[in-house]
Amino acid sequence: MAESMQRIASAFESARDLTLEAAAVASSRLGESSYFHYSKSIDSESLPGLLNSRYTREVRDGMKRVMSLMGSGDSSIELETHFADIVKNIGSDDVKVRRMVSVYLLRYAETNPNLALLSINSIQRSLSDSNPDVRALALKTLSDINIASLYPIILHSLKKTVIDSSEVVRCQVAMTLLKLFKEQGISIKDDVMPMLKSLLADSEPSVVSAALLLFQKAFAQELQLLHGHYRRYCSILNQLTENAQAIMIDIFIAYAKEYLPRPMVRDTSSDAEAIQLPDSFNQIPFPVYDVEYDHDLNLFLSSLKKLLHSPNAMVIVAVSKAFYQLSSPKTFKDSGIVDSLLRLTVSSYICSEIKELVLQSILVYCCSDPSLFRSHYKRFFLMPSDTENISIFKLKILSILVSDSNCKHIVNELKFVAGTEQSASILVEVSNTLSVCAQISSKWSSQIISWLLDRISSNTPIDKEVTASQINVLRSLIQKDPIKHIATVVKLSKMLSNHDLLPSAKAPIIWLLGEYVQVEPRICPDVLRRLLPQFSKEHAHVRLQILNLAAKLLSHDVDSYSGDMEYDIGTSRIGQMFEAALQLAKFDDEYDVRDRARMLASIFEQKRYEIATLLLQAPKPYPMASLNYCRDSFNLSALNLYPDMENYYELLPWNADPQASDRTPCEVKDYSKLKNSFSSSSYFGRNEVEFTNKPKRSASVSSVPSNTFTSSHGKKYQLQSLDEFFSDVSARQSVPKAKRVIIEESTSEETDHTDDESGSSSGDESTESSYVSSSEEETTE
């Protein structure tokens, strides 16, 4: 009783010694706030005590404080002064502590290289740790320490761990090799290449994923390394990581263009000879056709279809790129890629940045073949949740998909957006899309011109940039049929004085009036008279167009002059206005305006009126909407894509003479066989050949079962059934002094030696077999 009371008193004494700090740490498991206050109490004096403590919990608290100071940029504690106390914990048994020390080393190793080198031995010893996470962390820490003299040590460690039994460590080997290649460059190619070949032949998909990243970043041109892995990679494509799937697709596109035969297109409506798949996506001349693909190319395309339902949007975009570059429009449409891409545009689980990339991909495909997405044009109507960039790309897609059958719905949608949208950039793109719709037919052209003119003339406050874009659209549409739109030109001329227009809006109107000199010359002189007094206050582009307008008026006036006397510029009212504009332009600040004034003065002073007529009054071709007539599908600059997307969709040419290559699968390296462990998997996974019936050794041991089992170490053990085990119960009760005989059969020599000893023992003694090690072996007297 006294002893029990003493134990209780000792427990209370230990509980009283529990400090407030330890209690705060314990309560931190319930929330972050309590630990935050406790962490604040760790100052520069108490931190070394925690870092040098023999208790892992206190060391972890100290390292958490260090991480907090590093992350917040707090300079209240000079962490560099505690370098030795922190780094010595690199050999801690706690993996979390090791990770935090590694992060600290990454930050401060360069400031204390000598002290950092003292931890290398501990890190190298961790490469032999039984925990694969610890081994991978040690390898990562070695590569993160940015000290040039460590390169030989890191390379030696990589050569050792590239055949590690854990796939986690081998993945880290690939990442470390990539890091070394970025630092050292092509100089270490000979050292990295053998390890890369080993990683590419790995049986684990996770290791292959890391190896493909290394291959793409460091050896993208060494495609011949993939010959023996091509077919295996196609079969395990869906097992790779999502990032590696996109990488492998890009690599195999280049591989197929270089080493695989180009698909053949055969016209099924005639007996014409088959042709090679054209370089451009939509240049197949046959209305009905079939495509013959090489076996290996078809294997790759078939494996891609499994990824169309991937949760990663970039994987689906990569799949669409592969079909776009390697197949025909018919195969592209039949593969289901269109539905997968459309699903991404409306998914609520995808961020706006990814949707922008998906829409740019669709824009490229629509420019190549609008029929792919034309039936889904309503999926590109603007939504209230769309960002500005998403809306702009949708409008560009609509401008390509517009046709006579869907023009009514698209125009109505654009008018609605123009009346509700506030963003100037979106409204400018709406105007550009309307200009494409107006080119469908003269009916739509008249309706859109009337609507745009009403929008500009209304008192509704509109951004000047939007007004300028609408005027430019009007100019391009009026130029197509100037006689029909004289009234519209008169209204535009009045806007020069009634509206506060941007230079980008004024200059097109003045240019359009100059083109109308031959159609209706009575409008232009009065406009020029009102523009000349404001010449010096206008923008350079506007001043240049005023000078051109004066020259066009004078040239037309000279051509239409029918008097008997020679035309006199000085006595003509139009000639006088031209002289005034010429005089103002000669002293202009802009070189372009002065140069144009000198050229025009030279022409008219030397009376070269024919040249003036050809130069100023020649009919100009009216502009066309480039997106609606995207004949060259590879001219991506006209689509205003992001620079990275332009590079991503750069077309790779087919190799005209692909080299014959052996794509027979090479030997796969399975490192899981190196794992030495005795478990249920090692037992039940054994080949049936290992379970054999052994012959009876002697009559004295006839009761011992003859079944044997061979362990993963090569040792043999006898097995016993449940009935045989319980059959010896009565014998053991009748002979209480009998000793247990445990027999181990590791080799044939040990078996013979055991038989000799068993023959000299008593035959009445019972035996019992079980799984034992050599340290438990006993013999009978």
From Swiss-Prot:
UniProt entry tagged with the keyword Membrane: yes
Record key words, sorted: Cytoplasmic vesicle, Golgi apparatus, Membrane, Protein transport, Repeat, Transport
Record bears the keyword Repeat: yes
A single BP term in Gene Ontology: protein targeting to vacuole
Entry's Gene Ontology cellular component terms: AP-3 adaptor complex; clathrin-coated vesicle membrane; Golgi apparatus
Signal peptide: none
Ranges of Low complexity composition bias in the record: 759-774
Lineage top rank: taxon: Eukaryota
Record field: compositional bias (Polar residues): 699-712
UniProt protein name: AP-3 complex subunit beta
Gene behind this protein: APL6
